């Protein structure tokens, strides 16, 4: 009885015309091996054949009429045979090929081996099938040594062949055996190295990622690692097949994440790949002398403190709780306070800060400091004028160029001065590249290399009343040490030569053109409105640098817009001495902290509402030129 469609076949197997299940190669036995089958296997065959013999003969003619014209040689015996597949599962084989059973042992003498069975009559088919049934009953013990072929894809070469008369070893007159391509190919067609993924969160900055320009960061990672990078607004996704390269790429992104984006570009100077952040090349510093301003001298400051003490009980409680955490280490370490970022560092040495305080206290402290700047809407602002502070030092213009070494991953800072090139030596250059008559050519000179030991970046909102807008300040906390010549500076000779090769063309309108030879400069664009730098200096004071920076775009084709910026130093020797004495109370630290906060608040307000800052005159530049060698460490 034909069992077509009556049984489910194991997945992954190829079934000819959807009705047959094929055995493995040689039926699971090797060619030439003794024809021994399992006893249970033979008994099952014998019992099934005896029970179904009469039924086969009665329904033979009926089943023959139900066959498809393409398969006239198909056996109608309906014997149910089982074999052990190569996957360890029993598979049903109902109605195998009678004419194509491939027996070459001489017992099946009546098998038709002609490929032209399609033209035979039904009587011949019936006679052939009857003979095949009888022969199959006599050859039960030897049937499963046959190949999968048969006459459909069969071969007269024996049981080891899967090929056919069509000339293909795996073919057949009807397509024959297709192997197991549908099973194995689907399993391995998508194989390949698995990419490891690392996700780094990025704080938003100026409408974009704090990393800076996406193309520049991609170019850096592409040259330094084998990782792939995708930068979103607040997230950077790094993918790499190698775990070591992934860690290196993540370390680079984390270092850039904690760096304020001055100007970001990937440059190739003399064959070395570096990343550079360029500060504004023109700004001056105004240092507030200690004691020049008494925070308690004005009614506005006194009103500020009265409001804090009387109406902001929640602020006082949180601030006291924060300072109480300093007791555990005040006997062995000096607290380093970034007042604007709301972080407290413990300086075990002058250059290496310890781990900052926990995140929950950081949030409390940040919220508390915000109330210092704006506890109420009725505060009268007190703006600093020139009569309220003493200017005792003024430095000439210089440029900071911060560099990330992609080999050692060290952050370096290069301080350069701008020197005007005399027209007699650059007449040809100015004529060709700077047609404007009011243009002057400058270059960077006297570079000094500093190693940045710690960099931290954060943002603080200064609420403004008089100006009608808020001031967003980016705060960088870092310490740096100068690399003395002879102690490793020689490895940065190429960097120094590259800085010296940069030429700057300036005009009266403020549009500057930078010529950078022998480099691959990516398009860069970064916007910084304000930033505050705070670090511990050697003169025992905590210094706050309030810089006013304007956006600059660095490209190799278009002119660059560069404007002046301002820096203000606000020091607090009293707070530093208080911590250094290791004999302080929470109230004392809180009072000094409020004073310093108010001083910084007034300084920022002054610069917002003042007129455009005027650069120092030539007399001042000459007078204090010798002070440039005393750069803070």
Swiss-Prot record:
GO cellular component entries: phagocytic vesicle
Biased composition (Gly residues): 152-178
Positions with biased composition (Low complexity): 32-80, 104-148
GO molecular function, one term: histone acetyltransferase activity
Keywords: Coiled coil
Region feature Disordered, mapped onto this chain: 1-188, 611-633
Recorded coiled-coil stretches: 580-607
Keyword Coiled coil: yes
Xref: InterPro entries: Integrator_complex_assoc
Cysteines joined through disulfide linkages: none
Transmembrane segments annotated in the record for this chain: none
Full protein name: Putative uncharacterized protein DDB_G0284097
């Amino acid at each position: 009885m034909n069992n077509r469609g009556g049984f489910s076949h194991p997945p992954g197997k190829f079934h000819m015309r959807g009705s047959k299940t094929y055995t493995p190669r040689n039926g699971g036995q090797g060619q030439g091996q003794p024809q021994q089958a399992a006893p249970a296997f033979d008994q099952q065959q014998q019992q099934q054949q005896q029970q179904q013999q009469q039924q086969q003969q009665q329904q033979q003619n009926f089943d023959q009429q139900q066959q498809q014209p393409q398969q006239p040689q198909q056996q109608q015996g309906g014997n149910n045979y089982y074999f052990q597949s190569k996957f360890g599962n029993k598979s049903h084989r109902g109605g195998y090929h009678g004419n194509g059973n491939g027996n070459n042992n001489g017992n099946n003498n009546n098998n038709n081996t002609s490929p032209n069975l399609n033209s035979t009559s039904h009587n011949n088919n019936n006679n052939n099938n009857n003979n095949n049934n009888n022969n199959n009953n006599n050859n039960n013990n030897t049937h499963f040594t046959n190949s999968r072929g048969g006459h459909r894809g069969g071969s007269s070469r024996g049981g080891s062949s899967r090929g056919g008369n069509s000339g293909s070893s795996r073919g057949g007159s009807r397509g024959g055996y297709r192997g197991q391509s549908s099973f194995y190919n689907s399993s391995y067609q998508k194989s390949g190295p698995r990419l490891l993924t690392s996700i780094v969160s990025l704080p938003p900055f100026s409408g974009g990622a704090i990393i800076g320009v996406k193309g520049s960061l991609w170019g850096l990672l592409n040259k330094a690692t084998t990782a792939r990078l995708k930068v979103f607004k607040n997230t950077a996704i790094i993918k790499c097949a190698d775990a070591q390269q992934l860690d290196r790429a993540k370390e680079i992104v984390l270092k850039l994440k904690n760096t304020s984006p001055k100007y970001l570009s990937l440059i190739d100077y003399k064959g070395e790949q570096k990343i550079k952040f360029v500060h504004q090349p023109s700004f001056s510093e105004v240092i507030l002398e200690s004691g020049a301003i008494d925070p308690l001298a004005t009614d506005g400051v006194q009103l500020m403190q009265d409001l804090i003490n009387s109406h902001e009980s929640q602020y006082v409680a949180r601030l006291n709780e924060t300072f109480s955490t300093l007791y555990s280490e005040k006997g062995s370490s000096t607290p380093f306070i970034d007042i604007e970022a709301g972080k407290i560092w413990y300086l075990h040495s002058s250059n290496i800060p310890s781990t900052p305080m926990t995140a929950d206290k950081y949030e409390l402290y940040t919220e508390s400091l915000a109330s210092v700047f704006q506890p109420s809407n009725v505060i009268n602002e007190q703006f600093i004028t020139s009569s309220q502070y003493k200017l005792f030092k003024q430095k000439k213009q210089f440029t900071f160029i911060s560099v990330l070494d992609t080999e050692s991953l060290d952050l370096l800072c290069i301080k350069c001065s701008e020197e005007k090139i005399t027209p007699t030596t650059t007449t040809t250059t100015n004529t060709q590249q700077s047609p404007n008559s009011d243009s002057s050519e400058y270059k960077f000179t006297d570079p000094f290399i500093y190693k940045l030991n710690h960099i931290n970046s954060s943002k603080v909102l200064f609420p403004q009343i008089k100006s009608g807008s808020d001031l967003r300040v980016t705060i960088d906390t870092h310490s740096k040490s100068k690399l003395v010549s002879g102690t490793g500076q020689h490895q940065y000779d190429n960097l120094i030569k590259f800085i010296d090769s940069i030429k700057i063309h300036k005009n009266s309108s403020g549009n500057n053109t930078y010529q950078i030879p022998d480099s691959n400069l990516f398009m860069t664009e970064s916007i910084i409105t304000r930033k505050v730098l705070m670090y511990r200096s050697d003169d025992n004071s905590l210094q706050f640098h309030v810089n006013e920076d304007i956006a600059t775009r660095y490209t190799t084709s278009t002119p660059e817009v560069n404007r002046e910026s301002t820096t203000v130093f606000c020091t607090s020797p009293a707070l530093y001495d208080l911590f250094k004495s290791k004999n302080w109370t929470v109230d004392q630290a809180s009072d000094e902290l409020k004073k310093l906060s108010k001083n910084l608040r007034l300084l920022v307000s002054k610069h917002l509402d003042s007129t455009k800052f005027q650069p120092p005159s030539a007399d001042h530049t000459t007078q204090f030129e010798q002070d440039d060698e005393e750069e803070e460490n």
